[in-house]
Amino acid sequence: MTGSPLPARERAIVLRKERLGGDHVRLVLDAPQIAPWTRAGQFVHVLCPTEASLQHFAEAKGRVLAPGSRLADSSHFPLLRRPLSVHRLCGPQYAADRLRAGPHSPSTTSWPRRCSGLELLLRVVGSGTAALAEREAGMGVDLIGPLGNGFSIAEEGQEAVLVAGGIGVAPLLALAQELRLLGRPVTALVGALDLARMPLGVDPQVDRSFADDQLEFMLREFGEIGVRSVLVSEREHGMLVTEYLERFLERKRHEPLVLYACGPKAMLAEVARLAGRRPCQVLLEERMACGVGACRGCVVKVRGEGRTRFRTVCKDGPVFRAQDVLWEEMQ
């Protein structure tokens, strides 16, 4: 279910920028038009170009560019907006001590929420994200949002299990906030190539806790809101997060669980397989242009009403039921 009736375009203001491990950057933004309506799993479409790149584009417009010239290389023109999941919401309702205590009265969980800030977590991979990572406190960021359909919240009595791979952890922190606001028990299983590239704060006892197979408050951002977590490092532990998930599900085989996942497609396909008949929602990440379903550049095949259908990740998703996605068709 989407948040606001219509997405808003807003010039959000950067309140703080944090450089994290592995080329990750966290931007804390003041976005009073978008933040109160944002639901976990939704995204904002961000205009990333620097003023310099736009100036170069304006100067080049209307003339033929020589092949091989710097301005002819489209990588220097991050003109398309970048879809970025909302990482965390900021406001009195989302204070860490309140989320640890949860649940809250219906009046505090209705829409719009009493918050005006949101956080974006990004990994610098190209010219667009590099330009966005250059924003400093006081500078503006052009956003459209909230966009897409977010997560459906676990029913009372179900434990929510969040499974993240790499930068896929970004939208799951906002989901953890939402679940804790309603008092749901939450466990986060987070996979990373190595500990140094983890974009969240890591407890120094992570290796001991992993060896003891104990779920502790190992990731700071999850722990401070009452979510137990385990960090699985492929390099340090020689294990994928899906392998740990299989072990975890075996221990919890008689307990009511609902799974949520975001990460590489191969990881999501394996999470869907391991989930079996358990309810499981996945957030898909696709390249997209318009962000509103018009260009149909981000379609995926899903099962629906007895036949295969094409759905857009930006408008129909980015969250889908794992059992509906035709994983064998995913590239």
Where on the chain are the PLM-derived regions?
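FNR/FR-type flavoprotein reductase catalytic core
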Residues: 127-289
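Ferredoxin-reductase
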Residues: 2-137, 194
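Local cysteine-cluster metal-coordination motifs and their immediate loop/turn environment
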Residues: 171, 265-266, 285-319
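SAM/dcSAM-binding transferase cores
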Residues: 312-316, 322-331
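Short, surface-exposed amphipathic charged segments that create phosphate/polyanion-binding patches used
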Residues: 103, 203, 242-249, 294-302
